Amino acid sequence: WQGYFSYNEIKAVSESTNTLFAASENALFSKNTATNEIKTTNTIDGLSGQTISAVYHSVKFNKTVVGYENGLIIVINEADGKMLNVVDIISKQLPAELKRVNHFMEFDGIAYISCDFGIVQFNLASMQFGDTYFIGDNGAEIKVKQTALFNGFIYAATNSGIRRASITNKNLIDYNQWTTIVGGSWVSATTFGTDLYAINALGNIHKYNVGSNSFVNSIQL
């Protein structure tokens, strides 16, 4: 069989030293920037036909992790092309509409998975899930759009403020360990160079000010 998939509408991207990984609705492609070689991966190769919502490539483990709107995660071992379907999020006793995978962030061998209910740990070496963080008020579900690591803290952009906690805190499952830095609805938090930036639901870019522990300098997209 030969597959014909649209790669025009890119939903998520990730990169390694010399390769760019991109996801469309139900397929992946990668481009080696040194050789210009392009590789495609789709349902014929083993991907799910569900809608992709996030992608991340781990340079350390040479694995590409694909997240879906229904909570499915597929881990691709780039060394041999083998795929592992991980259904732990799908199996959680949560409403189906909260299981969407929004983003992956890696630290110390752990992928922190942002979902519409909170954050989940996934060990990239053992391929096993760890703790789940419900960081909403009083430990409620909260939509986490993206996380970023900055100055020893994990920052979570949510639909109810930007919240942070020490990445080395052993008790992050306790919502009391998370502090709200700013309220409002946020869609992104990311580092660029030596700075931390966040984008709110209105499309304004804010830069984090370490001295005042706040986000300032709004820029309209």
What are these regions (language model features)?
Residues 32-36, 77-81, 123-128, 166-171, ...:
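Short loop/turn segments that connect beta-strands within beta-propeller blades
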Residues 1-16, 42-61, 86-107, 131-151, ...:
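Short coil-to-beta transitions that initiate beta-strands within beta-rich domains
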Residues 15, 23, 31-33, 57-59, ...:
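Generic beta-strand structural signal
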Residues 23-43:
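Beta-propeller domains
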